[in-house]
Design a protein with these regions (language model features):
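C-terminal structural segments of small proteins and small subunits
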Residues: 7, 65-96
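Terminal, regulation- and interaction-focused segments at domain boundaries
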Residues: 1-20, 24-31, 35-36
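Intrinsic-disorder/low-complexity, polar/charged segments enriched in Ser/Thr/Lys/Arg/Asp/Glu/Gln
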Residues: 1-5, 45, 67
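A short, structured beta-strand/loop element
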Residues: 56-65
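Feature captures hydrophobic
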Residues: 4, 27, 49, 92, ...
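Residue-level recognition of conserved beta-strand positions in structured domain cores
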Residues: 50, 61, 72-74
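Intrinsically disordered, low-complexity acidic/polar segments
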Residues: 15, 57, 79-81
Length: 99
């Protein structure tokens, strides 16, 4: 499966970033007509999965001391949404971390 990777720099504590990124990811999933989001945090890392436009999409989030990285695996049939997904994730996460 093709992968989308977005990394956003930050200067906040890992706990604060986790609290801010969670609603940003939830909003991004909703913006992409996503349903059935499963988001499982284990300290500074999360796995997620949701359905959108008939596709099952999964990925992970890694929060490091100076950056947060979101990896998204898209089915081949959803490749037409790759750039839109990348921009949507980058914008949502950056906005959440700016607040």
């Amino acid at each position: 499966m093709p992968k989308v990777t977005v990394t956003v720099e930050h200067n906040q504590s890992i706990g604060t970033v986790v609290q801010k990124v969670t609603p940003a990811i939830e909003k991004t999933v909703t913006d992409f007509q996503g349903q059935d989001l499963s988001l499982d945090w284990q300290e500074d890392r999360a796995d997620f999965k949701f359905k959108s436009l008939g596709f099952t999409i999964q990925g992970d989030i890694q929060v490091d001391p100076t950056s947060v990285t979101v990896n998204l695996e898209l089915p081949f049939a959803a490749m037409i949404y790759k750039e839109k997904a990348k921009k949507g994730i980058a914008n949502s996460v950056a906005k959440a971390l700016a607040d």
